[in-house]
Amino acid sequence: MQLKRVAEANLPTPWGDFLMVGFEEVATGQDHVALVFGDISGQTPVLARVHSECLTGDALFSLRCDCGFQLEAALSQIAEEGRGILLYHRQEGRNIGLLNKIRAYALQDQGYDTVEANHQLGFAADERDFTLCADMFKLLGVDEVRLLTNNPRKVEILTEAGINIVERVSLIVGRNPKNEHYLDTKAAKMGHLLSE
């Protein structure tokens, strides 16, 4: 187990009250958070979203990506379902970090797509480690999920890590003129499924 569960508290939101559970990576001390809505115990698979940190989209309302739109839609869907989990995966910019993400944005402004920009900076298209999320699910006592994602790689990695993904639930929101090239690149070069 790469993580330990270290803290929890109630978190009221516009969609209802979630339980916020804090985790810490044993090796690095990096923190991650789960937002739990309702009773997630039992045999019924849990609706869940693994949401990677995106300061620009989640908190600064950037239109360059669909992250903030996905975060809001996922919390809303989980609350409507009456139970579910959002894992807030603290790997900013597909795990290249905030400053490198800003550098990647500058390269995108020069005409590179999101994958090419990462490569120009010496990174893979996606540096994230989703096995940490499997540990979070296990520490929450969940092993069967209906995963809110457009990314088949998340499904593969979580499945390989022992989480039974019984259904992939599309989360297609937030397309706009500022991010359509970004989304098209994610579909063409990273295999994201962006049509219903």
Swiss-Prot record:
Enzyme nomenclature, EC number: 3.5.4.25
Family matches, as Gene3D superfamilies: GTP cyclohydrolase II
Signal peptide boundaries: none
Swiss-Prot/TrEMBL GO biological process terms: riboflavin biosynthetic process
Pathway(s) per entry: Cofactor biosynthesis; riboflavin biosynthesis; 5-amino-6-(D-ribitylamino)uracil from GTP: step 1/4
Xref: CDD domains: GTP_cyclohydro2
HAMAP family: RibA (MF_00179)
Assigned protein family: Belongs to the GTP cyclohydrolase II family.
Self-association state and partner proteins as the record states: Homodimer.
Function of the molecule: Catalyzes the conversion of GTP to 2,5-diamino-6-ribosylamino-4(3H)-pyrimidinone 5'-phosphate (DARP), formate and pyrophosphate.
Protein name as annotated: GTP cyclohydrolase-2
